[in-house]
Amino acid sequence: MWPAPCSVGRLLIFFMCSSSGYVVQGCGPSPGARTTLGSPLSLWSIKTPSHIFCTRRAINLGFPSPPLVQLIFWSLNAGLDLYLCLISSCGFSQVFWPVEAFCSFSLSFFALALSHKFVICRLDQHIFSGFTKSLKNLPPCHRTDI
């Protein structure tokens, strides 16, 4: 049996962005715990109206780049975070081939971001040059979001 945070139903709910009001909790061993993975880059909270998923791997390339390039890098990093999270708490490495899972997660984040289902808010004082014009002046996150 997989632990509760790793159930297929919850993953499907997350990826399908349902309107059920479900909040995606972190992948830690304790219920409701949130994890912080990745290098100490800019902290971001990635939210939809019914889901909250926080990651530390929002990428800032440090130089001007086309929005699509930034979105691709962000998607890859978000996919890597989720993959590492599942491995650490669920042992998913025994279920998925690493490359296949990483690519699947990254493509999912990329598709969701393109569909504008995510609202991104900043947790630090730096305004990340966002992927679209609507993200150039990001509202600060509430601490309850993380």
From Swiss-Prot:
Q: Which GO terms describe its molecular function?
A: protein homodimerization activity
Primary localisation category: membrane
> How does this protein sit in the membrane?
Multi-pass membrane protein
Question: Which tissues is it found in, per the record?
Answer: Expressed in brain with higher detection in neurons than astrocytes. Decreased expression in Alzheimer brains. Detected at protein level in brain and cervix.
Q: Which GO terms describe its cellular component?
A: membrane
Q: Superkingdom, according to UniProt?
A: Eukaryota
| Compartment(s) where it occurs, according to its Swiss-Prot or TrEMBL record | Membrane
Regions that span the bilayer: 67-87, 95-115
Keywords of this entry = Membrane, Signal, Transmembrane, Transmembrane helix
Q: From the Swiss-Prot or TrEMBL record, give the protein name.
A: Stress-responsive DNAJB4-interacting membrane protein 1
What species was this sequence derived from? Homo sapiens
